[in-house]
């Protein structure tokens, strides 16, 4: 579902986002009443805005390198800026990847003084954006940190070998999240680990497709 456009970039909302939001608000309404449900809705809107600005950071930085963005889609657990093409230089990928967490860091810095002045919700907003920025810097695909890792490795190994090594490292993080999730019975960690494994497999298939017809095989 397309909501609006920013600088010619369509902003879309996946249907699962609305379903999950409705579930969370309904649960809070039944469990804790109208006030708690309203606060949950406000938090969800703040998270929505933060993720959108994060993805716009990627998209507008990519535009500086001549790379257009087809759309930005927001999902329950994050967003995706669909670039028209991959960056051709490691430096481009590095700056595009870092732009998203940098936006979250800037939002946290803006909100922090407001929190110190006692503005309601500012502290939570700052903490949320700080957590988003740090979480996205985890060096595992498809997180921004995974792309930063590949950009750094590409300077020494080339993009093909760098992608293989970055995906191998990403698998360790994915299995780590799953192991900790099982040990602590944390559904969130299990979902993150499963999502990372899915994304790693998709990137592996994408690279294998690009290598089709060459003498090199892509396997991890």
Could you tell me what each predicted segment is?
Residues 1-220:
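Hydrophobic transmembrane alpha-helices and their immediate loop junctions
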């Amino acid at each position: 579902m397309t909501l609006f456009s920013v600088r010619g970039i369509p902003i879309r909302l996946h249907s699962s986002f609305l379903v999950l939001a409705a579930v969370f608000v309904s649960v809070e309404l039944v469990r804790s009443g109208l006030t708690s449900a309203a606060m949950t809705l406000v938090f969800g809107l703040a998270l929505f805005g933060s993720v959108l600005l994060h993805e716009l950071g990627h998209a507008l930085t990519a535009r500086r390198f001549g790379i257009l963005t087809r759309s930005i889609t927001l999902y329950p657990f994050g967003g995706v800026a669909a670039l028209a093409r991959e960056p051709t230089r490691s430096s481009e990928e590095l700056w595009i990847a870092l732009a998203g967490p940098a936006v979250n860091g800037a939002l946290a810095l803006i909100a922090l003084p407001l929190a110190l002045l006692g503005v309601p919700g500012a502290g939570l907003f700052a903490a949320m954006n700080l957590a988003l920025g740090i979480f996205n810097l985890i060096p595992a695909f498809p997180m921004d940190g995974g792309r930063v890792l590949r950009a750094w490795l590409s300077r020494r190994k080339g993009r093909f070998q760098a992608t293989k090594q970055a995906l191998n490292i990403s698998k360790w993080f994915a299995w780590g999240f799953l192991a900790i999730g099982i040990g602590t019975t944390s559904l969130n960690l299990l979902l993150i680990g499963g999502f990372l494994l899915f994304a790693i497999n998709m990137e592996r298939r994408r690279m294998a497709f690009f290598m089709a017809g060459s003498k090199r095989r892509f396997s991890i």
